[in-house]
Design a protein with these regions (language model features):
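Conserved N-terminal alpha-helix of the aminotransferase class I/II PLP-enzyme fold
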Residues: 55-99
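Active-site PLP attachment segment
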Residues: 209-238
Length: 372
């Protein structure tokens, strides 16, 4: 079998030299790095309810057998999308295989050459890659900076259609977008606003129908897999006809769809509300202990479940990751080029199932590292 071209092999060597080489690993220890915010991924009820429904499915138990526009659009999809409309109080929902394919799919289909896109500088890679596939002009504005957004718009506003893309909770920094202020700005200038709610859906309530389009993923707080776009029926109809990442891929299997259905139903329960309260308490406890240990200078400015320990470079981020793993904590370093140079960090994700003792021991280990 032929090997990679020399220049590509050299690029791997360059990554190794700069502590940026990635490899697939398994991690053991207390979970402080998964996106399973509410613990739904370990919730047996979701699996049991999905399996019960699967046993009533008439055929194709193992796979969807095709694209949603061919044989893959089984009845479980119809039931789920109706549930999503009721849960999120929107006119239409369109399920995709992942959040990445959802963002790639709507951006490449809807955004046209004569359009303008303004997006937050910290938007997810799926949004950036979607914009690369679009012929439109796209410009980033400084993270959560309304002043810079307004300046960019004033310089570039001579376009028929303008779109603004942001996230509700940002996946790396963990901070919240000023959605109310952004919405006022968009309404004033007739800009279509899109919000990626991957890291907030299921935890924080939003008025989804006020946006042109919202993205909700099921692999975070819902603990399963897949994603949905929340939108108008006209947008859904257009995407069914033009979104290539929907049209030309095998649909999700019935069991996966039933697990999403069960997770959405669980998210509306009293049990889920108690888990959201527990998660909020874990966040408060984390910040209090960090302050007690004089660690606030090392922390990101975040009040969400996504926290972070700032490091000076890739090498220190890897070193701290290994140190914490030796202390039986499962965390991962976020390195350049995923983040800018000088912004490397250990990403700490808090969950409703983390105990106060686990949080305290984690922060004590971090304190010990920086004191050594």
């Amino acid at each position: 079998m032929d090997d990679l071209p020399l220049e590509l092999l050299q690029s791997l060597d360059h990554k190794k030299e700069n502590h940026a080489f990635r490899s697939l690993k398994t991690f053991e220890g207390v979970d402080f790095f998964s996106n399973d915010y509410l613990g739904f991924a370990r919730e047996e009820l979701i699996h049991e309810k999905a399996l019960e429904k699967l046993h009533t499915f008439p055929f194709n138990l193992n796979g969807s057998t095709g694209s949603r526009l061919l044989s893959g659009n089984h009845k479980a999809y119809t039931e789920l999308e109706q549930t999503l409309c009721e849960t999120f109080e929107v006119e239409a929902a369109l399920v995709y295989n992942s959040g990445f394919s959802a963002n790639m799919g709507w951006i490449s289909a809807i955004i046209q050459k004569s359009d303008l896109v303004l997006y937050d500088a910290l938007c997810h890679a799926s949004i950036r890659d979607g914009l690369k596939m679009s012929p439109a002009k796209s410009y980033k504005f400084k993270h959560n900076d309304l002043s810079d957004l307004k300046n960019k718009y004033e310089q570039l506003k001579k376009h028929k259609n303008v779109y603004l893309i942001t996230e509700s909770v940002f996946s790396v920094d963990g901070d919240f977008a000023p959605l109310d202020e952004l919405k006022v700005f968009c309404e004033t200038h007739q800009i279509r606003m899109i919000v990626d709610c991957a890291h907030s859906a299921g935890i924080y309530p939003y008025n989804y129908k006020q946006y042109f389009l919202s993205i909700v993923t099921f692999g975070k707080s819902y603990g399963v897999h897949g994603a949905t776009l929340l939108c108008s029926q006209n947008i859904k109809d257009y995407l069914v006809n033009h979104s290539r990442s929907l049209i030309y891929t095998t649909a999700l299997d019935p069991f996966t769809i039933y697990k999403i259905q069960a997770a959405i139903e669980l998210s509306r329960s009293v049990k889920a509300e108690k888990l959201r309260v527990k998660l909020s308490e874990c966040i408060s406890h984390f910040l209090k202990i960090a302050e007690d240990l004089n660690l606030m200078a090392y922390l990101l400015n975040s009040n969400s479940a996504i926290q972070g320990i700032n490091c000076k470079d890739n090498a220190q981020a890897i070193d701290l990751q290994n140190y914490l793993q030796q202390h039986k904590f499962a965390l991962a370093a976020i390195r350049y080029p995923t983040v800018a140079k000088g912004e490397e960090r250990i990403r700490v994700v808090l969950h409703a199932f983390n105990t106060k003792d686990e949080i305290k021991r984690l922060l004590e280990a971090i304190h010990s590292y920086f004191q050594s």
